[in-house]
C-alpha cells in the first residue's frame, strides 16, 4: 500500500515521502496515529496544497523538543530513593515511568515513552546515564542517581 508520510518516521522516511508499506502497518498504526494518509490522487493534491502548514508544524515540534533537551541537559543529576538491601540490590526495580516522574518533578516534562532503557529496568543502587528520545532528531542525556531509601 502506498502512503504519504505526514511526519518523520524512523527507518521509513520523512514528511512528504511516498512510501510503500504493508497494509496492516498502514491501517493499524500509521493512519490512526495521523502519521500518514493513503497516496490517492486527491490526497496527493491536498498534501501539496498544505505542505507548508505541515512543515511549519514539524518545525515547531522540533524547536520545542530542542528547548526541552536544553532544559534536560542543564539539570544536575536526578535522584531516586528506593528501598534496597545491604548489598545495594533494590527491592523491585526502577523503570521508565519512575524515571519520567523523577525528571518531571525536577522541572522538565518527560513522558515515559521518551525514556530509553535498552538494558532493561534498574535493579541496583548507583549512578546511571539515561538517554531520552524527545523527538525523531533530538536526544538528551541525564545522570540518574539511585540511592537507598532511609
Swiss-Prot record:
Cellular component per GO, a single term: ribosome
Pfam families, sorted: Ribosomal_L9_C (PF03948), Ribosomal_L9_N (PF01281)
InterPro entries referenced in this protein's UniProt entry, alphabetically: Ribosomal_bL9, Ribosomal_bL9/RNase_H1_N, Ribosomal_bL9_bac/chp, Ribosomal_bL9_C, Ribosomal_bL9_C_sf, Ribosomal_bL9_N, Ribosomal_bL9_N_sf
Statement: the UniProt record of this protein carries the keyword Nucleus: no
One MF term in the entry's GO annotations: rRNA binding
UniProt keyword list: Ribonucleoprotein, Ribosomal protein, RNA-binding, rRNA-binding
GO biological process: translation
Similarity remark: Belongs to the bacterial ribosomal protein bL9 family.
Function, in words: Binds to the 23S rRNA.
Name of the featured protein: Large ribosomal subunit protein bL9
